[in-house]
């Protein structure tokens, strides 16, 4: 158990201090700290903590989300669309899991759940009759403005 805590702390420190542009870079930084971790383990950990890739001066870098605000979400959500049974949200690569978690927490009373890939989220409402209202609420929550 102590090893997992040490690995978690090392990973958090890497992302909070300098970030990393690839999972391989995270593996290399861990290795320099004496921690051997495979790319697939790093990938699972990044999903677990809802790490996202944020564009910056040095290119996109993995980072840990801190809070929801207009600047952190607005550039990550590209569209919110829906049909008669499903809402589909397109996001920046690597941010769908974190955004889906925000939606799950905020809309737990009106949705059955979310399914997130790398850059796409499927949202299933409890009642199909309310889908347009839920889609608009999600859109407003995520600060996405339709054309």
Curated annotation (Swiss-Prot):
One of its GO terms (cellular component) is cytoplasm. Keywords: Amino-acid biosynthesis, Arginine biosynthesis, Cytoplasm, DNA-binding, Repressor, Transcription, Transcription regulation. It is found in: Cytoplasm. The keyword Ribosomal protein does not apply. Its main location: cytoplasm. One of its GO terms (molecular function) is DNA binding. Pfam families: Arg_repressor, Arg_repressor_C. GO terms for biological process: L-arginine biosynthetic process; protein complex oligomerization; regulation of arginine biosynthetic process. It comes from the Bacteria. Signal peptide: none annotated. Pathway: Amino-acid biosynthesis; L-arginine biosynthesis [regulation]. Belongs to the ArgR family. Regulates arginine biosynthesis genes. This is Arginine repressor. The lineage of its organism: Bacteria, Pseudomonadati, Chlamydiota, Chlamydiia, Chlamydiales.
């Amino acid at each position: 158990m102590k090893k997992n805590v040490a690995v978690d702390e090392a990973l958090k420190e890497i992302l909070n201090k300098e970030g990393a542009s690839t999972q391989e870079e995270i593996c290399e930084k861990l290795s320099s700290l004496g921690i051997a971790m495979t790319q697939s383990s790093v990938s699972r950990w990044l999903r677990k903590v809802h790490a996202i890739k944020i564009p910056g001066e040095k290119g996109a870098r993995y980072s840990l989300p801190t809070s929801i605000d207009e600047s952190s979400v607005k550039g990550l959500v590209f569209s919110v669309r829906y049909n008669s049974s499903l809402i589909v949200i397109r996001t920046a690569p690597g941010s769908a899991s974190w955004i889906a978690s925000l939606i799950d927490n905020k809309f737990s009373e009106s949705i059955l759940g979310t399914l997130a890939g790398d850059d796409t989220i499927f949202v299933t409402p409890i009642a199909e009759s309310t889908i347009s209202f839920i889609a608009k609420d999600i859109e407003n929550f995520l600060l996405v403005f339709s054309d």
